[in-house]
């Protein structure tokens, strides 16, 4: 077993390491040689079979899953349920002991109690199982990503194979629309682009080509990865990784192999069980010894021991906690947070660090034109539907020239039948940048289609990674000018070097060094804002060289690509969501650290972080300080910088201590260009600091981090199936602001669970104490076991649940996250208040009512002591009371049952006050008010239920409840009032002397 664990740990540590391969660096000939493949014919069938035998099929290995019955048993026998099962078994044991000793009187009580306890556990176990049945289907969702078929070269023949039959060294062809069937080294490519977003988090499609461009295998252009989508062009590649050894396979192995540990609330409930069990066993054993010393038979003493332990078990609490969490989960679902795991409801409330993805979570995942540069000035683009924010002259020649090039030099088109849809919401064919430009042109001119029709496209060279530009030639809409119009867009520096003139303020002027500097300043400024900048230029081809009908050749350009006229720049960004800055500010005031973890470029990441407030105004990074002081970065003390932007490259070989140093000393952090393994390392680093970590993500690459986090939050709209399976919670609107709502709800439910528990536990003392007096002073039993059940599973249930609806006492988002070590769900102070203070007053109320009724019927209090043996003896039918009246056995038992009923009603009456004081932990009830209508209903409900149980005919047979005289309801009222006054005084002192001894002893 230990060996297996060691092996699993070793495997996971391997998977956590960065991808370390050299297939992208070595010459292609060496690649063929290493893989035993032939560029002309591919593998032979014999080679393929041998490779498959050696490496296995090209598919993901499913992990060992926990059988459903084991999950069900965990719900049925785990945690709190175990305490109730112990109680049930002890009841059956007591029943067995009494049955064997021939004591018929209490037989049925213990039997009923055992059956009811077992039923409660089974019902709540089934309920929890259905609520939390998040059977980890992570691997199933990875299977959905696996391509089904692939076109491969075997023995010189192109054959269609099942993707799982591919093996190392196979040469395959991939075209637009396919999923990449394995990890491939690119041999040749034609305008080939892949969507790596689910793997690396980059929202832009990435061009792939045979050139080696980066040491990092995830960044180089000559590798394409298993299960990513081909979105443009065609490609030929050689298989260098299959199944579990692909990048995707490693992520799958990491996500499914991680051990997630217990949730904070599960730890709290375990801690609570220890306390309750400790109290129960201590009391039970103490009174077992006392009973023995007092001369009771050992069988009686064992029954007493069991009775005390069972009376200590709050039978209704398991159901209360489950229902409270379910209600909060439903409330969160209505606010766009879908909780898959009930315990995650509270985890979000105790979160102290949020590691958020950028694309789609903090931003809109919709590239938008943000700025333009023409006529020598930077202008903010207007992306409003009605153009109400326009800040530039749309009649200027500079703008008209730029927008015409933008409309023509683009392959993006609106999908059909969307004329009634607002422009910003229309779907577009083409990549994200092209779509942004198309929408910008359509918003400002409203006639993209018309411009294209008037200037018919003749020839085009599509964008490719080598040229870094796109160029097209069009007929001129000005029919009097027969010249063809050439338009070009691309990387600004590449466009500028192809231009000899610039169009400025309606005139074409020569490109001077001064103008180049103005261009560079604009380019740097826009780039520094984290925006993706494109340059635009045009040229009217001379009529003498390019007459009407000239045969343009796109493959071997027979037209000029230099000496062009520069028109301007457009810059795009994936803009932040409107609600995010406010949400980040709320997190900060709630003491929650927000860290951005993204696969995007550091400059873009930093710009978005600044715009949403993750890096607050005035806080500098090491680079900012170095730039301000004009010194090298190495001379700046990292601790002087409050903010940090960490490149994924720095994390490749970082030690845990160095990462801890970064996390500890920088309150504001952005991790950029991170890989899936690095996201996981960052989460583990935060957890080492003692933080409770929430992680947001939408890609497959986020799934290991989502699984490892204390709470993983996936995106409902843009999220991949894999990320949704790995997460504990799904944001239905993909909005970071919804997490803050979730944190608020989580904190509120933790506070309210404390209130529910203190309310429920208080009635334990009036339930246990009758039993103790029964043993110590030999009095007739004041409260029966069945009656205890009527309280725990009857009158107390609805009030306890109603506290889940209580409003927050103060702004819970203005305090720091709870410390899991010191701020427990149930602590000594809560036990002291429930048992030692309020519980004692309640017990006094019960005994007062008991003695009043006994005295009224003839048994004065001092005459009850030592009476039990005669009272419980069937043989005694002439027991005399304090006034000389004789009582038969049946009459005595009827009086005893009336006392049980009155004691039960008195507990209900003092629980009125207990429920009202439990509404707040510090504030006065008068401040809080009685706006919780569910709680108001609960007060009426428990009273009506008590009356129903007391006055319904037939209850004397089933529950031994007898109708009470009306005046027997009143003796407990002063005690109820006393509880209210006592607690209001305690809270008044709490508020007047914060941190004083009253707070230290009683504030739970």
Curated annotation (Swiss-Prot):
Binding positions (Mg(2+)): 698, 702
Matching SUPFAM superfamilies: Calcium ATPase, transduction domain A, Calcium ATPase, transmembrane domain M, HAD-like, Metal cation-transporting ATPase, ATP-binding domain N
GO CC entries: plasma membrane
Catalytic activity as recorded in UniProt: K(+)(out) + Na(+)(in) + ATP + H2O = K(+)(in) + Na(+)(out) + ADP + phosphate + H(+)
CDD domains referenced in this protein's UniProt entry, alphabetically: P-type_ATPase_Na-K_like (cd02608)
GO molecular function: ATP binding; ATP hydrolysis activity; metal ion binding; P-type sodium:potassium-exchanging transporter activity
Predominant location: membrane
GO biological process: intracellular potassium ion homeostasis; intracellular sodium ion homeostasis; potassium ion import across plasma membrane; proton transmembrane transport; sodium ion export across plasma membrane
Coiled coil: none
Keyword match Oxidoreductase: no
Localization: Cell membrane
Transmembrane parts of this sequence: 76-96, 110-126, 272-294, 301-329, 768-791, 828-855, 897-918, 934-959
Active site per UniProt: 357 (4-aspartylphosphate intermediate)
Membrane topology recorded in Swiss-Prot or TrEMBL: Multi-pass membrane protein
Function according to Swiss-Prot or TrEMBL: This is the catalytic component of the active enzyme, which catalyzes the hydrolysis of ATP coupled with the exchange of sodium and potassium ions across the plasma membrane. This action creates the electrochemical gradient of sodium and potassium ions, providing the energy for active transport of various nutrients.
Family: Belongs to the cation transport ATPase (P-type) (TC 3.A.3) family. Type IIC subfamily.
Protein name: Sodium/potassium-transporting ATPase subunit alpha-B
């Amino acid at each position: 077993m230990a060996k297996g664990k060691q092996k699993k740990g070793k495997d996971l540590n391997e998977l956590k390491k960065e991808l370390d391969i050299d297939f992208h660096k070595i010459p292609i000939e060496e690649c063929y040689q290493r893989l035993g493949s032939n560029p002309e014919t591919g593998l032979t069938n014999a080679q393929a079979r041998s490779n498959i035998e050696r490496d296995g099929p090209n598919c993901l290995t499913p992990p060992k899953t926990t059988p459903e019955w084991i999950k069900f048993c965990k719900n049925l026998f785990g945690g709190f349920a175990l305490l109730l099962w112990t109680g049930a078994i002890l009841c059956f044991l007591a029943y067995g002991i009494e049955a064997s000793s021939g004591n018929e009187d209490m037989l049925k009580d213990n039997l009923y109690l055992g059956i009811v306890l077992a039923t409660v556990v089974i019902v709540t176990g089934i309920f929890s199982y259905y609520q939390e049945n998040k059977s980890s289907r992570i691997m199933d969702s990875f299977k959905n990503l696996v391509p089904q078929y692939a076109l491969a070269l075997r023995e010189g023949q192109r054959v269609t194979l099942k993707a799982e039959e591919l093996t190392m060294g196979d040469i395959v062809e991939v075209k637009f629309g396919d999923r990449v069937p394995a990890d491939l080294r690119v041999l040749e490519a034609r305008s080939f682009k892949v969507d790596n977003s689910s793997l690396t988090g980059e929202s832009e499609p990435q061009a792939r080509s045979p050139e080696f461009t980066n040491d990092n295998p995830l960044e180089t252009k000559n590798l394409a990865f298993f299960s990513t989508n081909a979105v443009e062009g065609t490609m030929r590649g050689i298989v260098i990784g299959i199944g579990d050894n692909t990048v995707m396979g490693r992520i799958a192995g990491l996500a499914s192999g991680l051990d997630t540990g217990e949730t904070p609330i599960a730890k709290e409930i375990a801690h609570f069980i220890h306390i309750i069990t400790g109290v129960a066993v201590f009391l039970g054993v103490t009174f077992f010894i006392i009973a023995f010393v007092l001369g009771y038979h050992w069988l009686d003493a064992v029954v007493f021991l069991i009775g005390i332990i069972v009376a200590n078990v709050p039978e209704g609490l398991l159901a209360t906690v489950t229902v409270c969490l379910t209600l909060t989960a439903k409330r969160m679902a209505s606010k766009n947070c879908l909780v898959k795991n009930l315990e995650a409801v509270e985890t979000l409330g105790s979160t102290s660090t949020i590691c958020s993805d950028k694309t789609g979570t903090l931003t809109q995942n919709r590239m938008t034109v943000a700025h333009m540069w023409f006529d020598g000035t930077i202008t903010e683009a207007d992306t409003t539907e009605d153009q109400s924010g326009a800040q530039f002259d749309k009649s200027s020649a500079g703008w008209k020239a730029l927008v015409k090039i933008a409309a023509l030099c683009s392959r993006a088109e609106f999908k059909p039948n969307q004329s009634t849809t607002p422009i910003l919401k229309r779907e577009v064919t083409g990549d994200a940048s092209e779509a942004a430009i198309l929408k910008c042109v359509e918003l400002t001119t409203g006639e993209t289609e018309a411009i294209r029709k008037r200037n018919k496209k003749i020839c085009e060279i599509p964008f490719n990674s080598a040229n870094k530009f796109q160029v097209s030639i069009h007929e001129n809409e000005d029919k009097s000018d027969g010249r063809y119009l050439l338009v070009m867009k691309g990387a600004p520096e590449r466009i500028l070097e192809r231009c000899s003139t610039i169009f400025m303020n309606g005139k074409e002027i020569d490109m001077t060094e001064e103008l180049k500097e103005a261009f560079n300043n604009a380019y740097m400024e826009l780039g520094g804002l984290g925006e993706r900048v494109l340059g635009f230029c045009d040229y009217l081809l001379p009529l003498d060289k390019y007459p009407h009908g000239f045969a343009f050749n796109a493959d071997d350009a027979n037209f000029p690509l230099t000496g062009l006229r520069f028109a301007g720049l457009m810059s795009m960004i994936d803009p932040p969501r409107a609600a995010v800055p406010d949400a980040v500010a709320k997190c900060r005031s709630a003491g929650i650290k927000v860290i951005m973890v993204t696969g995007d470029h550091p400059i873009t990441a930093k710009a978005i972080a600044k715009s949403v407030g993750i890096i607050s105004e005035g806080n500098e990074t090491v680079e900012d300080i170095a730039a301000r002081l004009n010194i090298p970065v190495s001379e700046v003390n990292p601790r002087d910088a409050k903010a940090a932007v960490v490149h994924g490259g720095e994390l490749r070989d970082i030690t845990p201590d160095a990462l801890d140093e970064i996390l500890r000393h920088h309150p504001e952090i952005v991790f950029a260009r991170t890989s899936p393994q690095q996201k996981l390392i960052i989460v583990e680093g935060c957890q080492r600091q003692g933080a409770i970590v929430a992680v947001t993500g939408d890609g497959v690459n986020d799934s290991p981090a989502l699984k490892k986090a204390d709470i993983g939050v996936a995106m409902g709209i843009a999220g991949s199936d894999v990320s949704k399976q790995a997460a504990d919670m799904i944001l239905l609107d993909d909005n970071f602001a919804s997490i803050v709502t979730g944190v608020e709800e989580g904190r509120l439910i933790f506070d309210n669970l404390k209130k529910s528990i203190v309310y429920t536990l208080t009635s334990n003392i009036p339930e246990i104490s009758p039993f103790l007096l029964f043993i110590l002073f030999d009095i007739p039993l004041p409260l029966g076991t069945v009656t205890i059940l009527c309280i725990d599973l009857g009158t107390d249930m609805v009030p306890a649940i109603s506290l889940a609806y209580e409003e927050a006492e103060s702004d819970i988002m203005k305090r720091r996250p709870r410390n899991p070590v010191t701020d427990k769900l149930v602590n000594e102070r809560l036990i002291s208040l429930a048992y030692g203070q309020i519980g004692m007053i309640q017990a006094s109320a019960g005994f007062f009512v008991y003695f009043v009724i006994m005295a009224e019927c003839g048994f004065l209090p001092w005459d009850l002591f030592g009476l039990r043996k005669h009272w419980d003896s069937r043989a005694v039918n002439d027991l005399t009371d304090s006034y000389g009246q004789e009582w038969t056995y049946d009459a005595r038992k009827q009086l005893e049952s009336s006392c049980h009923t009155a004691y039960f009603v008195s507990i209900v009456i003092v629980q009125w006050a207990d429920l009202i004081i439990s509404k707040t932990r510090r504030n006065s009830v008068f401040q809080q008010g009685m706006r919780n209508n569910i709680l108001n209903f609960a007060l009426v409900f428990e009273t009506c239920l008590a009356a129903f149980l007391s006055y319904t005919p037939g209850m004397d047979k089933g529950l031994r409840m007898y109708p009470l005289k009306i005046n027997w309801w009143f003796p407990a009222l002063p005690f109820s009032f006393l509880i209210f006054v006592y607690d209001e005084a305690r809270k008044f002192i709490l508020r007047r002397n914060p941190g004083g001894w009253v707070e230290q002893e009683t504030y739970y």
